[in-house]
Amino acid sequence: MQRNYARSFLAMTATVFILMGVLLMWNWNPNTSASASRGAGTPAPGQPAWRLLDPIRYENLTIFPVVSSQDADTSDFATLDDALASGQAVVTEQGNYMRRTRDGAPDARAYSGAQVNQLVLVSRGKKPLVLLAGEVISGGKQDRIIGKDRIIPVGAPPLPLDVFCVERGRWTDGSAKFAGAKMMAHPSVREKAAVDQSQAQVWAAVRGQASMSSNLEVSRGASAGATASAGAPASAPPVLSSSQTAEVIASVAPTESYKQIYESPRVGSSVEAFAEQVERRFNRSTSGLKGERVIGIVVAFGGEVAWSDAFASSQLFEIYWPKLLRSYVVEALTRTASQENASLDDARDFLRPATGHYREETEPGVYSWRESTEGKSAQIELEALAPKPLTLHWLKVLRAN
């Protein structure tokens, strides 16, 4: 009898230790989920568990949707395009806005003159305002792009806004206020702002788009059928010859306006046609999801995984997706046509967190901006600190140089 009790006790003890071991292994990585058995990783510690869907391919662009069963509530945050359109935010050149004290009197420290790399942002809304590096705003003396991910708190006084110019040559008054262009600078330009934070390199990247002509040859259309998904239309987007593209670039000289180049009828039609093909495949790939939502993407050009944008919620992703997609398309059009394709394993490897040089900037009680660089990889996280800590945006890029 005692022997049986002893055996039962030992068996129960062993079971308890096994269960404890399983729980400890499960909790070692706070992002572990059922998808981990499929090899999916996580964008950043503390983010919801997620997995990658099969790749969506068109021409030399491959997109891997990132889906999650956990979807944060981000409805308490406003985005730049919406805030500018509704008047909840105003962006002007320095010197165009009179700063006032709390009692309404003019502030003697009012901003002096216009500056290339700094504007003034006034937030009047009742929600914190989210800004992402690379968002294009048009107006003032030159079109600009936002220089860094950040959050503007409710009730903030007029703030200096770090930006980069994407319209070299013009320095004359346009609209007094800036408007959201509903555009995101494509990765080659966005990287120079978000990671390198260099005006000279941003300008060089914008000017370098003349080289897109070498990748907009009619020969690209011949390869579309080889890379199109089964059952999908194989037609290629309208393309421009080298001379046609050079003509478009020349027509907007000397301002070298990023916005004008990519809104021109000929270049713009190529971008839109390309984007429609990708979006059709994307919608078909993600339409049957059950209990999961798309929160981000991993992007490859040819066989090289080069970029990823992920968000805390499907709501934020859906807001940014249209202009993100077109930015990836512009990048694909500027890159050499390739028959190589990145694999799902390549995308998973790319999402391995960078563990090299680390730096952090924090506005207490508002947000934390973190950057990690390792080799050619750079990873940036924007975390809201109120009303509770939440990583709103996660970016990883394979730097060009």
Per-region residue spans from a language model:
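N-terminal secretory signal peptides that target proteins for export/translocation
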Residues: M1-A6
